């Protein structure tokens, strides 16, 4: 039952993050849909971790070069997702209020992604490895 509660909480927080993102795009004062490109960063952020998990066979090691490289690429993707709306606001493509909403959505979504891996990455019966 704890897995179901965690899944519901993660779904709720993901919906809140996407709501912030949509508000940053669709409010009448903002009305520009360029910030939706951060959805690409949401999709590609866990890919380096998945690849490193498949390639790394020694799970007992405290560190491996492949895993560290995956963390580096994931960090670059996350920083790019936070930098993209700031750059759009700096060149006046979007307004700073929309940038704030997108940054709030980014924080919620990336914390949701991290929470997903913390909750379901244990390797028990109900985990993301089955998906």
From Swiss-Prot:
UniProt entry tagged with the keyword Isomerase: no
* Organism encoding this protein: Rattus norvegicus
Its chief place of residence is Golgi
Which sequence ranges are marked TM in the entry? 7-27, 32-52, 69-89, 100-120
InterPro entries from the UniProt entry: Vps55/LEPROT
The record's note on quaternary structure and interaction partners says: Interacts with LEPR. Interacts with RAB13.
On induction, the UniProt comment says: Down-regulated by insulin.
Keyword Cytoplasm listed? The answer is no
Swiss-Prot/TrEMBL GO biological process terms: late endosome to vacuole transport via multivesicular body sorting pathway; negative regulation of growth hormone receptor signaling pathway; negative regulation of protein localization to cell surface; negative regulation of receptor signaling pathway via JAK-STAT
Instruction: Report the membrane topology from the UniProt record.
Output: Multi-pass membrane protein
Show the Pfam families listed in the entry. Vps55 (PF04133)
Where is it found, in Gene Ontology cellular component terms? Answer: endosome; endosome membrane; Golgi apparatus; Golgi membrane
Protein name in the entry: Leptin receptor gene-related protein
The organism's taxonomy opens as: Eukaryota, Metazoa, Chordata, Craniata, Vertebrata
Q: Where in the cell is it found?
A: Golgi apparatus membrane; Endosome membrane
Give the molecular function GO annotations: signaling receptor binding
Q: What does the sequence similarity comment in the record state about its family?
A: Belongs to the OB-RGRP/VPS55 family.
Question: Tell me, what does this protein do in biology?
Answer: Negatively regulates leptin receptor (LEPR) cell surface expression, and thus decreases response to leptin. Negatively regulates growth hormone (GH) receptor cell surface expression in liver. May play a role in liver resistance to GH during periods of reduced nutrient availability.
Q: What are the alphabetically sorted keywords of the record?
A: Endosome, Golgi apparatus, Membrane, Transmembrane, Transmembrane helix
